[in-house]
Amino acid sequence: MNILLTGGTGYIASHTAIVLEQAGHHVVLYDNYANSKPEVALRIAQILGHPVTSIQGDMRDTEKLTQVLQSHQIDAVIHFAGLKAVGESAAMPMEYYSANVEGTISLLQAMTSAQVYQLVFSSSACVYGDPQYLPIDELHPTIPTNPYGRNKLQIEQFLEDVAHTTGKEGAKWQIVSLRYFNPVGAHESGLIGEDPSGIPNNLIPFVAQVAIGKIAQLQVFGDDYLTPDGTGVRDYIHVMDLAEGHLAALHFLPQHAGFTIMNLGTGKGYSVLEMVKAFELASGQAIAYQVVNRRPGDIASCYAKSDKALAQLHWKTQRSLAQMCESAWAWQVSCKRLSSE
């Protein structure tokens, strides 16, 4: 299959591109480089041993998207593109709604014009909001607490409405929305990984930059939660397991018309301090940290129930916490080397 990956040089998309190519598919990457760098496509090519097609473009450019879909004879789309920082979304809601919601509408308009009706959407556990029970399954109420989560939920609602329509000559939409939890780690090559610009928003990149000496210490937001060690618990999933989940969803699409939602997570939560200790073991470096006050809106625990993905996609996570941390550390060391060359 020919697969268009929007946001194709981003963190999760770049790892998915490798999994898809190695499974025999052909990927086309489409990105405006707001959250990534053009050289990621070159690193993907280095891992694969052959070049990949990478196109610069904005999701709101419907005409260009249509041309890309048609000229590359795209069979299915995996939609990763979008702004993604929770805190930033509260400060810049107009930019988030424009890039994320308008961008998705533009994509679906282009897909309709090009008669491409298979879509995997990159959603988020942020749509659930504060957990009302654990583990969180797909039937959990969706009450997002920030503009980013509301973006994702609105897009899902839009996709569900579109999935109830028919395309040209009665074609049926086949759409899967993957709600994933906290992706971490990197490809085993050390050539690609999570590469945040500025201060990292996510725990592991922050810890990695403390370990490498780029940041002095980690701030742990609260140690008085009702958890085993008092720090927040989250479901961390290796990015390569997540990438394989997208491949499984792609294979699920042809036999399943309509709109389907699935969680992708490990089903196990780790606390902030457990992650710090695991990273210390993986890196051999001591991680300096300071406990500070809780952040407004933070929750004690959040982890997934992914039984639906196991039953319908025949997918489950394979990689351990140690592998998550070891690969993230290898990538951080590689980043330091690449930036000095």
Question: What annotation goes with each model-predicted range?
Answer:
Residues 1-186:
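N-terminal Rossmann-like NAD(P)+-binding domain of SDR-like oxidoreductases, especially those catalyzing
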Residues 12, 203, 271:
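Conserved alpha-helical elements of sugar-nucleotide-dependent glycosyltransferases
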Residues 38, 181-202, 212-234:
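Short, flexible, glycine-rich and Lys/Arg-enriched loop motifs at helix boundaries
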Residues 54, 171-175, 197-203, 231-236, ...:
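Glycine-rich, flexible loop segments associated with nucleotide phosphate handling
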Residues 57, 69, 96, 139, ...:
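Pocket-edge positions in alpha/beta enzyme catalytic cores
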Residues 97, 145-153, 193, 197-201, ...:
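Short-chain dehydrogenase/reductase
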Residues 206-341:
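C-terminal substrate-binding subdomain of Rossmann-fold SDR/epimerase-dehydratase oxidoreductases
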